[in-house]
Amino acid sequence: MWRGRAGALLRVWGFWPTGVPRRRPLSCDAASQAGSNYPRCWNCGGPWGPGREDRFFCPQCRALQAPDPTRDYFSLMDCNRSFRVDTAKLQHRYQQLQRLVHPDFFSQRSQTEKDFSEKHSTLVNDAYKTLLAPLSRGLYLLKLHGIEIPERTDYEMDRQFLIEIMEINEKLAEAESEAAMKEIESIVKAKQKEFTDNVSSAFEQDDFEEAKEILTKMRYFSNIEEKIKLKKIPL
């Protein structure tokens, strides 16, 4: 106890034992620099501090901020970076974000905030659509791992697969009845379900080459799905 009191007296009188390091008080400049690494609000200049991921508005002046260019779609939509996505949760997050950043809510705000709301809304729409569909979600996940599939490529597809695609396309071209169309739709739907299950397993095992091959096949069948939709539209 005496040593504690003695130490307190030494601190009050301005003395300190030789060889014992003293804590230097944080200067005003140092204190201000502590937040200099954080992004600052374009409107008031205030620092955001940690936890920016969930902030769209400045905590000081409540001005809408610019979208974070480093944030990926999974983070934005509050999803794990995985091929398996809870689509109900994804839709809820989409609606939540649009209630925050949709341009309709910024008609009376500054032009800067109007521009930011347009960018946010577009980004949220793109993220939602990309993560909702298995094919676009898989391609995006591959891209995050540094792998991209060119738009027009056979990606060394085996001959048997290409023959299968050709035969389905021929059946579609010749289909004249509703029953024939439904049969082709059923085949394509079953194939896409099989591919979706397989690519999910490939991602879980970090087998990106396998995922790349399956996604390429999914893209072929996605093209057939689009042709089916077009053929259903009455001319």
From Swiss-Prot:
Expressing tissues: Expressed in lung, brain, stomach, spleen, ovary, testis, liver, muscle and heart.
Alphabetical keyword list: Chaperone, Cytoplasm, Metal-binding, Mitochondrion
Effect of mutating C61S: Abolishes self-interaction and interaction with HSPA9 and the CIA complex but does not alter subcellular localization
Residues binding a divalent metal cation, per UniProt: C41, C44, C58, C61
Listed GO CC annotations: cytoplasm; cytosol; mitochondrion; nucleoplasm
Signal peptide: none
InterPro entries, alphabetized: HscB, HscB_4_cys, HscB_C_sf, HscB_oligo_C, J_dom_sf
GO MF term list: ATPase activator activity; identical protein binding; metal ion binding; protein-folding chaperone binding
A GO BP entry: primitive erythrocyte differentiation
Associated pathway: Cofactor biosynthesis; iron-sulfur cluster biosynthesis
Domain J per the UniProt entry, residue ranges: 72-144
Chaperone is among the record's keywords: yes
Similarity annotation: Belongs to the HscB family.
Entry's disease: Anemia, sideroblastic, 5: A form of sideroblastic anemia, a bone marrow disorder defined by the presence of pathologic iron deposits in erythroblast mitochondria. Sideroblastic anemia is characterized by anemia of varying severity, hypochromic peripheral erythrocytes, systemic iron overload secondary to chronic ineffective erythropoiesis, and the presence of bone marrow ringed sideroblasts. Sideroblasts are characterized by iron-loaded mitochondria clustered around the nucleus. SIDBA5 inheritance is autosomal recessive.
The protein, known as: Iron-sulfur cluster co-chaperone protein HscB
Protein source organism: Homo sapiens (Human)
Annotated gene: HSCB
